[in-house]
């Protein structure tokens, strides 16, 4: 990621600095994806260098993992051998009940896995542009799909109200990612469960009723 090309960079750095007091020596931290998270990792690296602390990171994306590997104070862990003390991530949208749309960066499965695996909370770093009254106002819903099931999944999504399906490429897990538009359908936990029941769906970008703490 080219840091100089990140939009609203200074605002995102200010957000990133708000979680620095959560970092302690020896912790295992789940790390999401996206530009705000990328900048937060850079700020955490500065803190680790200054304090001579070390942490274990469990990144949700290959891009964040590569960034972490560049710092000698960060060890890359996994969910088999490590337990996450706390996590942080960004969001594409957040509603009044702290439900989220995530996955625009194609890392939604591992992001959700981190959030489900943390012992405490996940800090969600968001600026004012991410807040919406109703999920789906600004972004389509990302859905991660086993590649050979794309056509079948698309047909099944249309049966439950999808009006537009856009192929967006591949995830770090070598699955396909599609963005799905629903009209006259609430993007909520009920819909997330419906989508997950479709054979071939790996995960959805709906994050409903998770233990999160909003940082804004």
For the regions a protein language model found, what residue spans apply to each?
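Conserved phosphate- and dinucleotide-binding cores of soluble alpha/beta proteins
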Residues: 2, 62-216
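N-terminal active-site beta-alpha-beta segment that forms phosphate/nucleotide-binding
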Residues: 2-89
């Amino acid at each position: 990621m080219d840091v100089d090309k990140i939009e609203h960079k200074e605002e995102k750095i200010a957000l990133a600095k708000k979680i620095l007091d959560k970092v302690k020596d020896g912790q295992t931290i789940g790390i999401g994806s996206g530009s705000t998270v990328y900048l937060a990792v850079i700020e955490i690296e500065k803190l680790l260098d200054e304090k001579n602390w070390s942490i274990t990171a469990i990144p949700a994306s290959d891009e964040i993992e590569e960034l972490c590997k560049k710092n000698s104070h960060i060890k890359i862990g996994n969910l088999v051998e490590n337990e996450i003390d706390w996590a942080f991530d960004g969001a594409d949208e957040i509603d009044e009940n702290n439900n989220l749309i995530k996955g625009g960066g194609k890392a939604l499965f591992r992001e959700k896995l981190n959030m489900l695996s943390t012992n405490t909370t996940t800090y969600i770093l968001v600026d004012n542009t991410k807040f919406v009254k109703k999920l789906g106002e600004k972004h389509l819903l990302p859905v991660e799909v086993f590649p050979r099931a794309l056509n079948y999944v698309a047909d099944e999504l249309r049966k439950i109200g999808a009006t537009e399906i856009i192929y967006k490429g591949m995830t770090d897990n070598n699955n396909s990612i599609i963005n799905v538009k629903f009209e006259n359908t609430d993007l909520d936990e009920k819909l997330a469960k419906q989508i997950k029941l479709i054979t071939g769906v790996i995960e959805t970008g709906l994050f409903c009723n998770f233990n999160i703490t909003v940082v804004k």
